[in-house]
UniProtKB/Swiss-Prot annotation:
GO CC list: cytoplasm
Subcellular location: Cytoplasm
Documented EC number(s): 2.7.1.33
Stated name of the protein: Pantothenate kinase
Pfam families for this protein: PRK (PF00485)
Protein species of origin: Hamiltonella defensa subsp. Acyrthosiphon pisum (strain 5AT)
GO molecular function: ATP binding; pantothenate kinase activity
Amino acid sequence: MNPKNAHLATHYLQFDRAQWASLRDSVPLILTEEEIIRLRGINENLSLEEVAAIYLPLSRLLNFYISSNLRQRAILEEFLGTHKQNVPYVIGIAGSVAVGKSTTARLLQALLSRWPEHRRVELVTTDGFLHSNKVLTERGLMKKKGFPESYDMKNLVKFISRIKSGAPKVEAPVYSHLRYDIIPNQKKIVQQPDILILEGLNVLQSGMDYPHDPHHVFVSDFVDFSIYVDASYDLLAHWYINRFLQFRRGAFSDPNSYFHHYAQICEKEAMTVARRLWTEINGLNLNENILPTRERASLIMTKGDNHEVKSVWLKK
C-alpha cells in the first residue's frame, strides 16, 4: 500500500472496481448509450459499463443518504411542531481541471432525477461565480483564474446559503467557456430543487485553508455529501493537453472564442502552450489549493487510464 493509500485507509473504506460494482444491487440502468454520449466530456470514453459499475452504486448510496436526511428532517419538524420546509440536499463535486467533474455532475443529475421519487435535481457550476475578466484584469489575476482569489466568494456563499435556507427562487450567474467570461445580465434560476449538485474546483475549501481568519464561511459548510474526483498528476496533465488540442481543432476555431488565436498555431506550438498553461496555472492550482482538500470529501473516486474509475474511497 502506498503512503497516500495507507493514510486514506485510516479514515476511508476502500473498494476496488469489482467490489464497488457489486454494490449496485438491483438498480436498473435507465440511461441509453445515446444519452451517455451526450453527457460525457470532450476527452472521456464514458461507457455503459462504467455507468453500471461505478455510477449506479454511487446513485444508490446517495439515495440512501438523501432518504436518511429526509427522515431526520421529518423527525425534527415533528418534534418542533413546524411545517415541512423544502431544503435542498447539496452534493458537492470537486477535483482538478480536466479530471471529469462536469461529466460526473451531469451523470449524477440524470441518474438521481430518475429515481422513483422523481426528485428535481439542479446542477450549478462555481464557474459562474468567477470574477469577470474585467475585474480579474484590474486585480492582476487573469493568470490565477480558478485559484481561490479569482472567485466572488461572498456571492457564492450567499447563493448556497439562500439555497439551504429554502429560498423559493435563487439566481446564479452564468459563465461562458467560449467567451472565457461571465455572461452579463444572464442568470440561472434555481427554484427549490430536491437536490442541488454544485460542481467546482474549490467546493471543499474550509476555514482550515485560512487559519489566520476564523470568520470565513465556506461553501463546504453547506454541502451534505461531497465527491472528489481524483487522478494522478501525470494523467491529469495528459488529459488537459489532449483536451486543449481537441478544443483547438473544435471550439477554438469559433471566431467568438476567447482562445481563437490558438486555432491559428501549429500542433507542436499548441502542445507547448498547453504544457505551459498546465504547469504554470492548472497544475499549480491543483497542488496548492485543490489536492489539499481531497480528504475532506465524503467519497473519493480515483481514475486510471481512459478516465475509468479504478477505486472508490468512502469516508467511515
